[in-house]
UniProtKB/Swiss-Prot annotation:
Functional note: Sigma factors are initiation factors that promote the attachment of RNA polymerase to specific initiation sites and are then released.
Any one GO molecular function term: sigma factor activity
UniProt KW Transcription keyword: yes
Cross-referenced PANTHER family: RNA POLYMERASE SIGMA-54 FACTOR (PTHR32248:SF4)
Family to which the UniProt record says this protein belongs: Belongs to the sigma-54 factor family.
Stated name of the protein: RNA polymerase sigma-54 factor
Gene that produces this protein: rpoN
Keywords per UniProt: DNA-binding, DNA-directed RNA polymerase, Nucleotidyltransferase, Sigma factor, Transcription, Transcription regulation, Transferase
Keyword Nucleotidyltransferase part of the UniProt annotation: yes
Residue positions of motif RPON box: 387-395
Length: 414
């Protein structure tokens, strides 16, 4: 972490400035101009201008940015967060099912449809395509209704299943019309035709239409880019408001000299905000380098960041709230890069569970691994201390049978 410590400002100046201007650090980039103006209401020396670039695509182009939710330069804040909050048990009970679900979310286009190749996505995650598809089908139970469907017809079928109609004949009529949308007029004489059409007209088309209507511009604070085979961090300085001073007009007034000092303090606070966000970017690049090269996230605690800046976790949490980072893999909330660690170690629950799954997948079918042996292998790999009941708990959460039950199942399949 030397790269960060070498750049940190003196603690006294940092603490004094943050105490006075903490709202500047915590505000969202799109709200920063208003926050600065509130601080400068009674200061005639300050002029605040917004030089924000509305479209930063010329500076930073994400792959398939127009197609994918997480890769949108202009993207809905709430659709991703709405879906992410639903990726929990019992619908997604295992680490694997949750990982697949998050991958599906990342593959949604801006209308809410999933147009990715399932076989290819499953291969990337190391799961069977049937397992991947099974998880995708569970999206029929999520909101907004129809999300995750492959096309309009499947989106309507998802929404129909969510209606839970008491009348089975009406259900079948509606389903028949959906499957034959191009020639639905052929069923116009059916008894339930009009009622079925009324149901269809109430469906969302496309599934994410309500989010398209209230699309919010997400402006990243940071860019992490690969330039000349080197990963670098850049602050989105073009989107920051500027503060200029008209100090030459007033030199004799003590009152205005005081206002000049206040103005310079405001500039210092803004510069400190930039420096703080930039250093957060440096830390993320250092800790999550593998992620920015296309691999998995590493466990990273907010406490690590708080210790670097000598501030409380709650202060740092508020500082990164509603702030975004853009990289080749998309646009992400900065909080996306932090996880809850296991027993204050460097290893997260998710990493442990993934390794447990890998061990079971590759175990000797004649002599399946006991929980005690799995514990030994995990402690050896990650250099940490655990208890066997934790391994048993993780195994049960992942719906993995005991070693004796697995041995019996293996023999039955032989």
């Amino acid at each position: 972490m030397a790269i960060l410590r070498a750049n940190l400002s003196p603690k006294n100046k940092l603490n004094a400035t943050l105490k006075g201007w903490l709202p500047i650090l915590q505000s969202e980039l799109e709200d920063l101009e208003e926050v600065l103006k509130q601080n400068a209401l009674d200061n005639p020396l300050i002029k605040i201008e917004n030089k924000r670039i509305k479209n930063f695509s010329d500076r930073f182009n994400t792959k398939k940015s127009s197609d994918h939710l997480e890769n949108c330069a202009t993207a809905s804040k709430s659709l991703f967060e709405t879906l992410e909050s639903q990726i929990i048990p019992p619908l997604f009970p295992t680490e694997t099912s949750q990982k697949i679900a998050m991958d599906i979310i990342s593959g949604l286009n801006n209308e809410g449809y999933f147009e990715e190749n399932i076989e290819e996505r499953a291969k990337v995650l190391g799961v069977e395509s049937e397992v991947y598809e099974k998880v995708r089908k569970r999206f029929s139970y999520l909101n907004p209704a129809g999300i995750g469907a492959k096309d309009v017809k499947e989106g309507f079928l998802f929404q129909l299943d969510g209606r839970e109609l008491d009348n089975n004949e009406l259900y079948e009529e509606t389903r028949k019309i959906i499957l034959n949308l191009e020639k639905h007029h052929e069923f116009s004489k059916d008894f339930y035709y009009e009622k079925a059409l009324k149901i269809l007209k109430s469906f969302k088309n496309p599934p994410a239409i309500e989010f398209l209507e209230k699309e919010i511009e997400v402006i990243p604070e940071l860019f992490i880019l690969e330039v000349d085979n080197e990963m670098i961090v850049r602050l989105n300085d073009e989107s920051y408001p500027t503060i200029s001073l008209e100090e030459n007009r007033f030199k004799d007034s003590d009152y205005l000299k005081e206002k000049l000092k206040e103005a310079k303090d405001l500039i210092d606070a803004l510069n400190l905000r930039k420096a703080t966000i930039y250093k957060i970017g440096l830390m993320l690049l250092e800790y999550q380098y593998d992620f920015f090269k296309g691999k998995e996230l590493r466990p990273l605690k907010l406490l690590d960041l708080a210790n670097e800046f000598n501030h409380s976790v709650s202060t740092i949490s508020r500082a990164i709230s509603n702030k975004y980072l853009a990289c080749e893999r998309g646009v992400f909330p900065i909080k996306h890069f932090f996880s809850i660690a296991l027993d204050n170690s460097e290893t997260s629950n998710a990493v442990i569970k993934d390794y447990l799954l890998e061990l079971i997948k590759n175990e000797d079918k004649k002599e399946p691994l006991s929980d005690a042996k799995i514990l030994e292998l995990i402690e050896e790999k990650f250099h940490l201390k655990m208890v066997r009941r934790t391994i048993t708990k993780y195994r049960q959460l992942l719906n993995i049978a005991s070693s004796s039950e697995r041995k019996r199942l293996y023999l039955m399949r032989a």
